[in-house]
Amino acid sequence: MPINTFCKISLFICALFCSTVTLANPNVYVEGPSIENVMRASSYVSYTYRTEAKRHQWVGNDDLFFIRLSSIDTFGDQRSALIASLSPHSYSIERVSTNCKTKDTIINTRTRYDVNGKVLESNKEEEKIGRPIPDSYLAEAVIVMCDALAIIPANPNVDGEKITASAPFMNVINEHVRAKGVTRRAITVEQIEAHFKTTLNQRK
């Protein structure tokens, strides 16, 4: 690829990625593909959310959710992620897979815990939810898995056609969000643990 073409594509990637970051949910924490297996990743997410749940005590706080992209099929049409969602008095960890062409989404497993990590509910049956509603946390996860990830410059598989194909879906989500009058700003971090420590220290 000619160097000037590469530079143009890189600049376009950065511009599109920044626009996505600006409009995403302020309570979304995203970590890139992991080399860990799913069980270890689940434990890591569980530990992170116990820490955050105890800190917040669920008083006067909006629901939070944290996405950890899986290393399994990360760059294929079928992608997966671990999602931890914090709700009053409990938190859930879900394994979600999405077909990035159709946006059809399946919850593969879901486990709900109390603040101490005790299992309150576990469901290992697949739940087909189809195309998630635009302002749901699952829709946000689809953006991260399918669209936001596709425009990260570090992805060697990015090309102009892929970038162009990603834009319409993100625009649909963003237009829906703006219509609701919701201001959104993403916190996208490579090291979620370090980010949590910094954020929690600032609250003291």
Curated annotation (Swiss-Prot):
Signal peptide from the UniProt entry: 1-24
Keyword field: Signal
Top-rank lineage group of the source organism: Bacteria
Entry protein name: Uncharacterized protein PM1583
Source species of the chain: Pasteurella multocida (strain Pm70)
